[in-house]
């Protein structure tokens, strides 16, 4: 025979094996109901309204009327908004804190061209000076090395740099615009030989190189004397030509005064 339903109209209790998860969920809901009082708290325009007692079914019905989402039975759904509010408040607080830190850092930043005199002062104090002024590398090298051997080595290096010769044609570095790199290394060829070596990879024949010699001061004085003598001869020649021209001017004027006879005079002479 089928089991008759109870008189109160309630469902009979299910067996232990058939209850399963439903019993666990009902137990959890009863525990939450007993732990939290059935109070409804509403906050509207800064005012707080508390209603006691309010069952969850009424709250769900009100939310459905207002167009909210459907709530599951039990108070578990009522605890979700509180946790969401807590998360939102913590996120907002973190944002405010990060914004304050950013503003503090931005105050320290300066995108304008600020002259830092302290750094300039340190750099100026580290720089070498000569007679109260900033000295370059060349001046500092000349002034710092006051001893005789050091000065002699520096002068020897300068002379070696100045007095180099082309290894191909033998021309001096003073007679070429610049010494260039060659097969033997830097500053081993003259300008012409270095350019040919860089462009074609071959060295020009020394026979085509111009023969240029350095003139000594005695030779320069001799050439200067010869130039002066040539200049004096040219000046004397110009003076003699000017004198001859002035002497010939009166004769030319006399010839210009003697005019040739006209046609009328010729006809009268013939008649």
UniProtKB/Swiss-Prot annotation:
Compositional bias (Basic and acidic residues): 252-271
Domain Tify: 33-68
UniProt cross-references to SUPFAM superfamilies, sorted A to Z: Glucocorticoid receptor-like (DNA-binding domain)
Residue ranges, annotated region (Disordered): 1-23, 238-271
UniProt subcellular location: Nucleus
InterPro entries the UniProt entry points to: CCT_domain, TIFY-like, Tify_dom, Znf_GATA, Znf_NHR/GATA
GO BP terms, alphabetized: regulation of DNA-templated transcription
Protein induction: By abscisic acid (ABA), and drought and salt stresses. Down-regulated by jasmonate and wounding.
Annotated keywords: Activator, DNA-binding, Metal-binding, Nucleus, Transcription, Transcription regulation, Zinc, Zinc-finger
Gene Ontology cellular component annotations, sorted alphabetically: nucleus
Lipid metabolism keyword on record: no
Zinc fingers (GATA-type), renumbered ranges: 166-193
Domain CCT: 95-137
MF terms in GO: sequence-specific DNA binding; zinc ion binding
The family this protein is said to belong to: Belongs to the type IV zinc-finger family. Class C subfamily.
Role according to the record: Transcriptional activator that specifically binds 5'-GATA-3' or 5'-GAT-3' motifs within gene promoters.
Name used for this protein in its record: GATA transcription factor 19
Organism ancestry: Eukaryota, Viridiplantae, Streptophyta, Embryophyta, Tracheophyta
Protein encoded by which gene: GATA19
């Amino acid at each position: 025979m089928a089991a008759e339903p109870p008189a109160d109209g309630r469902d009979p209790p299910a067996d232990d094996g058939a209850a399963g998860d439903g019993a666990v969920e009902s137990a959890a809901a009863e525990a939450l109901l007993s732990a939290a009082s059935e109070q409804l708290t509403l906050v509207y325009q800064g005012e707080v309204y508390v209603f006691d007692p309010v069952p969850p079914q009424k709250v769900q019905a009100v939310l459905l009327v207002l167009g909210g989402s459907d709530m599951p039975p039990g108070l578990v759904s009522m605890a979700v908004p509180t946790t969401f509010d807590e998360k939102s408040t913590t996120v907002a607080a973190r944002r405010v804190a990060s914004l304050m830190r950013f503003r503090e850092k931005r105050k320290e930043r300066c995108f304008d061209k600020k002259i830092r005199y302290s750094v300039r002062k340190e750099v100026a104090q580290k720089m070498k000076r000569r007679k109260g002024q900033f000295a370059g590398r060349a001046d500092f090298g000349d002034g710092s090395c006051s001893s005789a051997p050091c000065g002699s080595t520096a002068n020897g290096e300068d002379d070696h740099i100045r007095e180099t010769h082309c290894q191909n044609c033998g021309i001096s570095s003073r007679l070429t615009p610049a010494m260039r790199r060659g097969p033997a290394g830097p500053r081993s060829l003259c300008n012409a030989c270095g350019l040919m070596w860089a462009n074609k990879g071959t060295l020009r024949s020394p026979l085509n190189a111009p023969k240029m010699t350095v003139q000594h001061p005695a030779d320069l004085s001799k050439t200067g004397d010869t130039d002066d003598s040539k200049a004096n001869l040219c000046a004397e020649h110009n003076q003699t030509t000017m004198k001859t021209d002035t002497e010939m001017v009166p004769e030319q004027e006399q010839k210009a005064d003697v005019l040739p006879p006209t046609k009328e005079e010729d006809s009268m002479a013939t008649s």
